[in-house]
Amino acid sequence: MKTLPKERRYETLSYLPPLTDQQIAKQVEFLLDQGFIPGVEFEEDPQPETHFWTMWKLPFFGGATANEVLAEVRECRSENPNCYIRVIGFDNIKQCQTVSFIVHKPNQNQGRY
């Protein structure tokens, strides 16, 4: 019986193959269509007990586009290549984070997590 190699899994979409930039943009478009406010966070070693990640700049309050968010993901990826990077979505009605997914893992191909 063939088994998959052991690998840490994090949050939504982590059991799927790595996302391309185009797939990340589609997920961000979904966040925007739902009225969520996107943001980018990074963490060097995300252990289960680590509840707070470092925010990359500020969340995109106002009229953000998927391309603007993707540009920030790329910039965060180039500044922090040894960190896990995720996109998050805030719901300003419920006043909480509603969505998050990993877009970059260290030691992976560029353009994919």
Curated annotation (Swiss-Prot):
Q: Which InterPro entries match?
A: RuBisCO_ssu, RuBisCO_ssu_dom, RuBisCO_ssu_sf
- Where does the protein end up? Carboxysome
Q: What's a Pfam family this protein contains? A: RuBisCO_small
List the GO cellular component terms: carboxysome
Do the record's keywords include Protein biosynthesis? Answer: no
Q: Which UniProt keywords apply?
A: Bacterial microcompartment, Calvin cycle, Carbon dioxide fixation, Carboxysome, Photorespiration, Photosynthesis
A GO molecular function held by the record: ribulose-bisphosphate carboxylase activity
Q: Does the keyword DNA-binding apply?
A: no
GO biological process annotations for this chain's record? photorespiration; reductive pentose-phosphate cycle
Q: What else is known?
A: The basic functional RuBisCO is composed of a large chain homodimer in a 'head-to-tail' conformation. In form I RuBisCO this homodimer is arranged in a barrel-like tetramer with the small subunits forming a tetrameric 'cap' on each end of the 'barrel'.
Q: Which HAMAP family match?
A: RuBisCO_S_bact
User: What's the family?
Assistant: Belongs to the RuBisCO small chain family.
Known partners and oligomeric status: Heterohexadecamer of 8 large and 8 small subunits. RuBisCO interacts with the C-terminus of CcmM, and can be found in complexes that also include carbonic anhydrase (ccaA).
Q: What does this protein do?
A: RuBisCO catalyzes two reactions: the carboxylation of D-ribulose 1,5-bisphosphate, the primary event in carbon dioxide fixation, as well as the oxidative fragmentation of the pentose substrate in the photorespiration process. Both reactions occur simultaneously and in competition at the same active site. Although the small subunit is not catalytic it is essential for maximal activity.
Designated name of the protein: Ribulose bisphosphate carboxylase small subunit
| Taxonomic source organism | Synechocystis sp. (strain ATCC 27184 / PCC 6803 / Kazusa)
Q: Which gene encodes it?
A: cbbS
